[in-house]
Each structure stands twice: as C-alpha cells, then as structure tokens.
C-alpha cells in the first residue's frame, strides 16, 4: 500500500506531456530559436540601410522582415512553452546566437574567425546537452495550480523587485547611460522576460480550461486576459529597447549577451513560479549546468575574439616559422 501510494504521488508530481508532444515542442523551439537569431541581424541591416539613406528605419523593408521574423519566432516560442517545460525551451535560444553570427558575417560583414566558428560549435553542443538533461515533466498543469503559484508570496516579492528595477532603469539610468552602456538596454529587455515567459506559459494553461469549457472557465478567461495584457505591455517595451540597442551596438554582441542574461533571469523566474526544477536529479542538474556553461563559453568565443585576425592560414605560417 505504501509503495503504491508513493508511486502514485511520484506520478502526480511528475506529470508531463507525451513523448510526441515533447518532440514537437522541441522541434518548434529549435526552429523558433533560429528564426529569432535572424531577427536582430535583419533589423540591424534595416537600420543601417535607413541611416545611409537618411530616412526612418520604419520605411525599410529589411527592418520589417526582421520584425515579422521576430513575431513568427515569438509565436513559435508560445507554442513550444505550451508543450514542454520553460526550462527546456528557453536555453535553446542559444542556437539562434551562432546562426545570427553566421548570418551577420554575410549581411553585415561582421567578422567570424576560426574561434567564432568553434564558439558556434560549442553553443550547438551545449544546447544538445541542455535538451538531454532538462526536465520533461510539468509541475503546473492546470489553471487552479497556476493561480496558486501566481499568488505565492515569494513570486510576488520577486516580481515587485523586478518592477522596481525596471522603473529605475527605464526612467533614470537608460536616458543617461543607455546609448553608451549595452548592459542597460539588455537588462531592461531581460528583466521583462520575467513577465513575458511566465505570462506566455500561463496563457497556454488558462486557454486549456477555456477551450474545454470547464466549470472554472470564467475565472480562466479573466486570468487569460490579465496575462495577455501583461504580455502585450512587456513585448511592446522589449521591442522598443531592442531597437534602441540595435541602433547603438553591434547586433551579434547584443544578441549574445542578451541570450545569457535573458536565459538566466527567465530560468530564475520559472524556477520560482513553476518549480520545474523539483523533479530534476543531481546528475541532470549538473548536466544542465555544464550545458549552459558550454553555451556561454561558446558565445564568449564568438564575441570576445571576433576582432582578432586569427585563421588557420596564419596558424600554419606560425607553426612553420617555429619549426
């Protein structure tokens, strides 16, 4: 009896989507990360073209292509978040960093040397490790559970801290230091991820009750509308500051740093709200830490050494001189 009860409890605490849903969600997440990786490059290209002509980037077709790609990528992320845990989807954004760097080397003529290519390989390898070790089960699967989590004092306190930091950054720090310090705009966009990603996940959960016409569908509808409003406001502010950053800084540098900071803050918010780490063992936790570290090292190689004129030909010449 005790064993059966324990097994039942374990099954209830580790509910998750079917393997087919996980595979579909992963596929959508991978495609979305690649699409998102192209958005910053296309938008930057449009901004550069508009500056060259002396017109607004709002009139440039390439900028609009990047904006549409961003919308498509966000829709893909929304679908992925409804199928698999947040902690599995968010780190896969790493795939967009090397893809964006390769695209930028062609469209924006940004440098990508041998170390940058090695960084692309490490980012992809780290993403595979993250997929293998990420939790596949959900800890919050109903609208009632979501409401309980949203009113948790720890999560409410975290959101209040994030909101205060955003107000400080937007109204005091950004006007003075935003154009010269890339971390200001990145911090604003990343902190907003504490609202956008949980809201996206919550909308998916609330929508299930609405579509199935459950007795709590009225409450679910109200919750869904509130989360939609939060999501909409967050995306608008994010969009504004992403374009401000692209006007002032290198697109691939912004994309790389943004990935690391955004992923860290989103995983923190998701850990507090959804408790998706509760079903992760020590081995998988260490595996995810190693995967995220590998991705971060790859991103550093792509960006920090991009100005070095370093290639295989020069390595061979150096070896010949040494011999």
Swiss-Prot record:
InterPro entries noted in UniProt: Mg_trans_NIPA
GO terms, molecular function: magnesium ion transmembrane transporter activity
Cytoplasmic side, ranges: 43-60, 104-111, 175-177, 240-253, 306-323
Entry's transmembrane regions: 22-42, 61-81, 83-103, 112-132, 154-174, 178-198, 219-239, 254-274, 285-305
The entry's keywords: Cell membrane, Endosome, Ion transport, Magnesium, Membrane, Transmembrane, Transmembrane helix, Transport
Tissue distribution: Widely expressed. Predominantly expressed in neuronal tissues. Brain, heart, kidney, liver and colon (at protein level).
Extracellular-facing ranges: 1-21, 82, 133-153, 199-218, 275-284
GO biological process, one term: magnesium ion transport
Membrane topology: Multi-pass membrane protein
Classification via Pfam families: Mg_trans_NIPA
Phenotype for residue 39 to R: Failure to correctly traffic to the cell membrane and diminished Mg(2+) transport
Biological role: Acts as a Mg(2+) transporter. Can also transport other divalent cations such as Fe(2+), Sr(2+), Ba(2+), Zn(2+) and Co(2+) but to a much less extent than Mg(2+).
Protein's name in the database: Magnesium transporter NIPA1
Species lineage: Eukaryota, Metazoa, Chordata, Craniata, Vertebrata
């Amino acid at each position: 009896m005790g064993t059966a009860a324990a097994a039942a409890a374990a099954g209830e605490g580790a509910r998750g989507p079917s393997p087919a849903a996980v595979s579909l969600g992963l596929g959508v997440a991978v495609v979305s990360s690649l699409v998102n990786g192209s958005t910053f490059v296309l938008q930057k290209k449009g901004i550069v073209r508009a500056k060259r002509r002396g017109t607004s980037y709002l009139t440039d077709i390439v900028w609009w292509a990047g904006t549409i790609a961003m919308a498509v990528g966000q829709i893909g992320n929304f679908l992925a978040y409804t199928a698999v845990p947040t902690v599995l989807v968010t780190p896969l954004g790493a795939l967009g960093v090397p893809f964006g760097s390769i695209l930028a080397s062609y469209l924006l003529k940004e440098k990508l040397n041998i170390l940058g290519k090695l960084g692309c390989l490490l980012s992809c390898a780290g993403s595979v490790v993250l997929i293998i070790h990420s939790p596949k089960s959900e800890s919050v699967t109903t609208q009632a559970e979501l409401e309980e989590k949203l009113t948790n004092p720890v999560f409410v306190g975290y959101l209040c801290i994030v909101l205060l930091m955003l107000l400080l950054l937007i109204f005091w720090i950004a006007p003075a230091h935003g154009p010269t310090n890339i971390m200001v705009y990145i911090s604003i966009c990343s902190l907003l991820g504490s609202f956008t990603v949980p809201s996206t996940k919550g909308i998916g959960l609330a929508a299930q009750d609405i579509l199935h016409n459950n007795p709590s569908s009225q409450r679910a509808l109200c919750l869904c509308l509130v989360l939609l409003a939060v999501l909409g406001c967050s995306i608008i502010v994010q969009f504004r500051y992403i374009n401000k950053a692209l006007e002032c800084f290198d697109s691939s540098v912004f994309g790389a740093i943004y990935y690391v900071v955004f992923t860290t803050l989103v995983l923190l918010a998701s850990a507090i709200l959804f408790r998706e780490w509760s079903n992760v063992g020590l081995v998988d936790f260490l595996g995810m830490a190693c995967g995220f570290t590998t991705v971060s090292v790859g991103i550093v190689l792509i960006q920090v050494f991009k100005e070095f004129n370093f290639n295989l030909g020069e390595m061979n010449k150096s070896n010949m001189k040494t011999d």
